[in-house]
Amino acid sequence: LAMYCERYEGLGIDLVGMNVNDILTLGAEPLFFLDYFAIGKLDHHRMVEIIKGISEGCKQAGCALIGGETAEMPGLYANGDFDLAGFCVGIADRDKIIDGKKVKPGQVIVGIASSGIHSNGFSLVRKVLRPDFIKQHAEEILKPTKIYVKPVLSLLEKEPVYSIAHITGGGFFDNIPRVLADGCGAKIHMGSWPIPRVFRWIQESGNVQAKEMYRTFNMGIGMILVTEKKRALKVISHLSKFKERAWVIGEIVKGEGVSVQ
């Protein structure tokens, strides 16, 4: 879609965001990032836009871009196709690593707003939305992944957070259970946060069931935090200092898995 809409800078931010947000779920601070860009015939404009995005993503995350690899491989890639990859190294104090073991029933789930689709679910987007509609709304559909590093690391210094999940591929149903303690499940309350219209476009255009939407997309929640009920408003207030919108969207219950109702 980025190629079709000729919007490349956001891809670099997406690449960094997917890495640093994953590291953040452990309570770790990203230190440095490296990228890999491979293409059949080097396109200077495209490469510059992508690298600008990677640099911007690293700036937002507060980590260093220390190097990377640019490979021109004619004959291996179709005209215009390219590969983009990267990895990040972070650090955390061993005794402060967030592993979900302190999660227990009665705690609440705070959801932090996403910027939109982020980086997952685009196979379905391409399937259900018309190309002309995508191009018309490209800025909204291709809005880069939100990077949560600075607000969440600041929060961890102030408030108790027992688990963090980055809502990526697999949506709520796959990402939340793996950060919960044994014997704990999550109950998510639909309607407890505003769902961006881009998800309504997808659901209505493709006649997609609600459960499938929550299994595929972030539905407006890019990251969830588990904390004590009595601290939830403090958590939300602290995040608001970084202009992050957040809501109590559910609670931890006895059992397993995730229910969205």
Residue ranges and their predicted role:
Residues 1-115:
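Glycine-rich phosphate/pyrophosphate-binding loop regions near the starts of catalytic domains
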Residues 14, 29, 69-70, 92, ...:
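Gly/Ser/Thr-rich beta-alpha loop segments that engage phosphate groups in nucleotides
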Residues 22-29, 66-71, 100-104, 122-125, ...:
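Low-complexity, flexible helical/coil segments
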Residues 37, 100, 120, 236-239:
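Short amphipathic alpha-helical leader/targeting segments
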Residues 37-38, 116, 230, 253:
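Short, glycine/serine-rich, charged loops/turns that create anion-binding
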Residues 46-61, 77-82, 131-142, 146-261:
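Glycine-/charge-enriched secondary-structure boundary and capping motifs
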Residues 105-139:
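Acidic, glycine-rich loop-and-beta core segments that form the ion-binding/anion-interacting portion
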